[in-house]
Amino acid sequence: MSMSDTLADMLTRIRNAQRSRLMYVNAPSSRRKEAILDVLVKEGFIHSFLVHEVRNGVKEINIKLKYSPKGESNIKEINRVSTPGKRVYLSIKKLRPYYNNMGIYIISTSKGIMSDREARKLGVGGEVICKVF
């Protein structure tokens, strides 16, 4: 049986790995997932990620998670907002800071995948992929 929401699977893998205090987690690769991970790296929620080929034509992402000096995870909450069955869109007027600007929405816009802060600077709205705090 095929998986219907591979992005939610990646977010769940990250959430579970951080709760288990793992340093690395792997997930199947796609360009959309890589763009989302780029945003998470820029915003300081994860340390880095590396894409490598597992088999001929099959790529996997190795995600290095980030923790505070006390050992607490940088990601307290990471949830999918827009799902394949229910898409959620926000215009620039309705795009407000998440969790008093301590968290972010990751948004797919006409100018690419970006954080809500970047979207407000550029004056664009779009589909809310997930929220991270």
From Swiss-Prot:
Keywords, comma-separated and alphabetical: Ribonucleoprotein, Ribosomal protein, RNA-binding, rRNA-binding
- GO biological process entries: translation
Free-text function comment from the UniProt entry: One of the primary rRNA binding proteins, it binds directly to 16S rRNA central domain where it helps coordinate assembly of the platform of the 30S subunit.
Q: Which GO terms describe its cellular component?
A: ribonucleoprotein complex; ribosome
User: Subunit arrangement?
Assistant: Part of the 30S ribosomal subunit. Contacts proteins S5 and S12.
The family classification in the record reads: Belongs to the universal ribosomal protein uS8 family.
Task: Look up keyword Ribonucleoprotein and say if it applies.
Answer: yes
Entry protein name: Small ribosomal subunit protein uS8
> What superkingdom does the record give?
Bacteria
Molecular-function GO terms, alphabetical: rRNA binding; structural constituent of ribosome
Hey, what's the signal peptide range on this chain? none
The cross-references to InterPro entries, in alphabetical order and at most eight, read: Ribosomal_uS8, Ribosomal_uS8_CS, Ribosomal_uS8_sf
**Transmembrane region positions?**
none
- What gene name is given for the protein in this entry? rpsH
Instruction: Tell whether S-adenosyl-L-methionine is among the UniProt keywords.
Output: no
